[in-house]
Amino acid sequence: MTHKFTALATSLLLAPAALFAQETAPEAERISMSQAIKSAQSSIDGGVLEAEIETEGDALVYEIDLVRGESVYEVTVNAATGDVMKQSEEQLTSFLSGLFQEDELRAAGTARDVLMTALTELEGQDSTWIEEVSLDDEDDRMVYEVELTDATGERELLIDATTGEITPDD
């Protein structure tokens, strides 16, 4: 009887630790957003419109929308390995043109180095994981809206697509 009680008590004591390990393991085992974007851009040489981490089945993946010329590409990158899993091309029909304004498409093509420098800087900070990046027009300037998780919790920042300046998203 005491062995059963000891086993039960040990299980109850270790359960929270196991749960915590399960929650934090994906971050420790995944590549960074900037690495995922580089992987996608090695497949499709384009500027970033949007990028986010998602769960697809039982795997974490990055879905990255890139623009090149008159086409938008969705590239799926395995978050554990960095391998490109799939890609699809969408022509800029009137529907897609409505989703992505001409200024956004142009800015995505020219902001490539600025974005990567800023993301690398953010990811260099302790325990920082970028969850989503999205190009948008805010107050007549093109910015990347960034959602990240760090030691202080979840935050949203803006990266100026021209200068690379990082500011809080108020």
Which residue stretches match the model-derived regions?
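Long, terminal "pre-/pro-" and other extracytoplasmic accessory regions
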Residues: T2-L12, L19-D170
